[in-house]
Amino acid sequence: MEINEEREKLIKKLKEFFQQNAENFKLSLALLFGSWAQGSPRRDSDVDIAVFFEEGKIDKEEKKALVRKITALLEERIKREVSILIIDPALSKPMVYYNALVSGIPLYVSDSSLLHHLRMDAIHEMEDFSSRGLKWQMELAGKYLKGK
């Protein structure tokens, strides 16, 4: 199967999954990002999905448990490794959030204004991050990789 055909089938399966299950998992948003969204996956590429849970309805531990459950169900369904990013505006990961929110393909959106708001926040965060310069970004990345 050609990679573009495989990509379209994958997106269709993911959209069906999230349309059927988003409410059960208390999701407001699910986006495909990374190599599959960009159209440049390798045969062994994992599937990167960003999710945003309904605000104020579940705690951090329940979110982690739901991510494990979603991951297991998706991996069984699509026969690929799945990596899920929880979108949490309180955490600062501007590059990852920017990639997921701005370049991602919507799989499930309960409220388009929420997606718009999160995208605008990601763009502003990235602009702030970029304005500090490459040297600062490299230092920050180095600290992050060292676990500091």
Question: Predicted segments — roles?
Answer:
Residues F33-S35:
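Glycine-rich beta-strand-to-loop/alpha-helix junction loops that act as flexible
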Residues A50-E54:
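Short hydrophobic/aromatic beta-strand micro-patches
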Residues K57:
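Short acidic, S/G/P-rich loop/turn micro-motifs used as interaction or catalytic elements
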Residues M1-L29, Q38-G39, R43, K60-K148:
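Catalytic core of pol beta-like nucleotidyltransferases
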